[in-house]
Amino acid sequence: MAGSLFDTSAMEKPRILILGGTTEARELARRLAEDVRYDTAISLAGRTADPRPQPVKTRIGGFGGADGLAHFVHDENIALLVDATHPFAARISHNAADAAQRTGVALIALRRPEWVPLPGDRWTAVDSVVEAVSALGDRRRRVFLAIGRQEAFHFEVAPQHSYVIRSVDPVTPPLNLPDQEAILATGPFAEADEAALLRSRQIDVIVAKNSGGSATYGKIAAARRLGIEVIMVERRKPADVPTVGSCDEALNRIAHWLAPA
């Protein structure tokens, strides 16, 4: 079809759409790009100003909710949808499950395993960023805020603390906090570097999301070594869809579902 994201000269190939934005999504796209059996594309939400290049055809921007995604899946004749978005991107995951149900397209979720506390960890588990704000308490603390920029505004109600805020892109609009430092950086972050950062800023508590994976685990390991508390925002219950924990598992599932009849 005109304007298609996919290769219109290869209509016989099953079309796979990856909903991306994670390291795992990019790795899966790279491996699928090397497989001539499939026609693969990836969609990014467009929340970062300078997204990394992808190894397959790329779409950037939202779909307009579950309705828009369902129309796209139908119009592009998608055979398989892979939800490889961030574990905390609950809205797009919900939309993907809804769109798959409406269209009858196969859907799998690629979710990196959660981190689990190890001996020496000082975790305070909370269910939301709002709860994390409350968990800081009233006493002034030196906080390393490592939850991304989208929900950082919640901490404006706790201006008594000192904040070091790390994100890929600047927090906009700027936070109304009297004592804050912004660090713009993209992982992976090594444990030694994270420990040096925590020491230099005299951090006594980290606020993090349980995103799993190795790229941002350095701060968790460094906190364990230094005896620093981590207020851990746990994941919400995922949508009830088939889920795999690695690219290898995803490729096996894809090969099974899209095997020639």
Swiss-Prot record:
Listed EC numbers: 1.3.1.54
Reactions that this protein is recorded to catalyse: precorrin-6B + NADP(+) = precorrin-6A + NADPH + 2 H(+)
UniProt-listed InterPro entries: Precorrin-6x_reduct
Any GO molecular function: precorrin-6A reductase activity
Pathway it works in: Cofactor biosynthesis; adenosylcobalamin biosynthesis; cob(II)yrinate a,c-diamide from precorrin-2 (aerobic route): step 6/10
Pfam families: CbiJ (PF02571)
Family matches, as PROSITE patterns: COBK_CBIJ (PS51014)
Top-level division of the source organism's lineage: Bacteria
Keywords of the record: Cobalamin biosynthesis, NADP, Oxidoreductase
UniProt record, GO biological process: cobalamin biosynthetic process
PANTHER family per UniProt: COBALT-PRECORRIN-6A REDUCTASE
Family statement drawn from the similarity comment of this UniProt entry: Belongs to the precorrin-6x reductase family.
Job description of the protein: Catalyzes the reduction of the macrocycle of precorrin-6X into precorrin-6Y.
Name assigned to this protein: Precorrin-6A reductase
